[in-house]
Each structure stands twice: as C-alpha cells, then as structure tokens.
A protein has these predicted regions:
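Rhodanese-like catalytic fold shared by cysteine-dependent sulfurtransferases
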Residues: 1-32, 39-74, 83-126
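Short, surface-exposed ligand- or partner-binding patches at beta-edge/loop junctions that are enriched
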Residues: 78
Length: 126
C-alpha cells in the first residue's frame, strides 16, 4: 500500500523541479507564482509576488478563474518543503497545463537561503 511519501516521489518523477539556485530566474519568467500552502502558512511569510491557493482547492480555483485557466501559463508552485507543490504540479499537468515547475525544497529552502520574503504583518501593541 502506498503512503503520502510514495505519492510525492511518484509526482516528483513526473514533474520539473526548479533548483533553488535557478528559482529567482524561473519566478521572474513565470506568469504566476502560486503558494499552495494553507492560508495561515502563507500569512506567516511568503515569496514576494506569490498568490495563495491552498492545495486542497487548487484545481477548482484554476478552473473557475479566467486569469488562471489558460493552459499556456508559465506557473511556478511552492509549498513548505516541496511535497504538496509536487502533487499540485502533477495535477496541473494532468489538467493540460504545459509549463509547470515546482520549487525544490519549498519555502523552507527559500527562507534558509536568505532569499526575499514577505514577512508576517503582526500588530504592534506597544
């Protein structure tokens, strides 16, 4: 019986993962940068320019948003460590999207490398 890790490994074998050192160029070339983490994760910090569409609703949102339904869009996806993004990339390819990439290592790798991010906007009570 397969587990989640097995499914992620299978997905990664079918998609293109962009290496961290190539990520900024891939993001600049992309039409859309999608963060597929949950909303609370996104609000805690994310890559500049990303829009948040959680993995659980991704296919529905893309199908119903005229700006996102064009199959020729160049899309870069990321999540926390790259598992959800790999599964999402596999789904988008199955939907007919032809230019889909997943960020290897996800937001954790991006953050650990000291790359630019939008930090949480927490209230200051002082």
């Amino acid at each position: 019986m397969k587990n989640a890790h097995d499914l992620v490994l299978e997905a990664k074998a079918q998609i293109h993962e962009v290496a961290l050192e190539d990520a900024e160029a891939a993001i600049r070339a992309a039409d859309q940068l999608l963060d597929v983490r949950e909303a609370d994760e996104f609000h805690a910090g994310h890559i500049p320019g990303a829009i948040n569409i959680p993995r659980g609703v991704l296919e529905f949102k893309l199908s119903n948003d005229p700006a996102l339904c064009a199959r020729e869009l160049n899309i870069v996806l990321y999540c926390k460590t790259s598992g959800r993004a790999a599964l999402a990339a596999c789904s988008l390819q199955a939907m007919g999207y032809r230019q889909v990439q997943s960020l290897a290592g996800g937001f954790d790798a991006w953050s650990a490398a000291g790359k630019a991010q939008v930090a949480a906007n927490l209230p200051n009570f002082e």
